[in-house]
UniProtKB/Swiss-Prot annotation:
Biological role: Binds to DNA and alters its conformation. May be involved in regulation of gene expression, nucleoid organization and DNA protection.
Protein known as: Nucleoid-associated protein HD_0326
Chief place where the protein resides: cytoplasm
Cellular compartments annotated: Cytoplasm, Nucleoid
Gene3D superfamilies named among the record's database cross-references: Nucleoid-associated protein YbaB-like domain
InterPro entries: YbaB-like_sf (IPR036894), YbaB/EbfC (IPR004401)
Organism: Haemophilus ducreyi (strain 35000HP / ATCC 700724)
Subunit structure, as described in the record: Homodimer.
């Protein structure tokens, strides 16, 4: 079924990929991504693990409607999460290149 040394090579490749994925996940968790809303008046910075690191609200918004500011913070956070997920997909693609994964399968499992 497997050629000479095929199973051993397959296991070795799987182990190497697992190590690369672990390293990449650690790197991603350390990255910071900033999302914005309100033309940059609200900025939310999160790390690769989606933990909020910093929120910046332009002073001009402090006089505005509280609900609008809350909506802008939520929108900036959602933008930051989207950017973090896009960055994670990009980084993980380098680890999984050459692998034939089913459509929609997310790594890590």
């Amino acid at each position: 079924m497997f050629g000479k040394g095929g199973l051993g090579n397959l296991m070795k490749q799987a182990q190497q990929m697992q190590e690369r994925m672990q390293k990449m996940q650690e790197e991603i968790a350390q990255l910071e991504v900033t999302g914005e809303s309100g033309a940059g008046l609200v900025k939310v910075t999160i790390n690769g693990a989606h933990n909020c690191r910093r929120i910046e609200i332009d002073a001009s918004l402090m006089e505005d409607d509280k609900e609008m500011v809350e909506d802008l913070v939520a929108a900036a956070f959602n933008d930051a999460v989207r950017r973090a997920e896009d960055l994670q997909k990009e980084k993980m693609a380098s680890v999984t290149s050459g692998m034939q994964l089913p459509p929609g399968m997310k790594l890590p499992f």
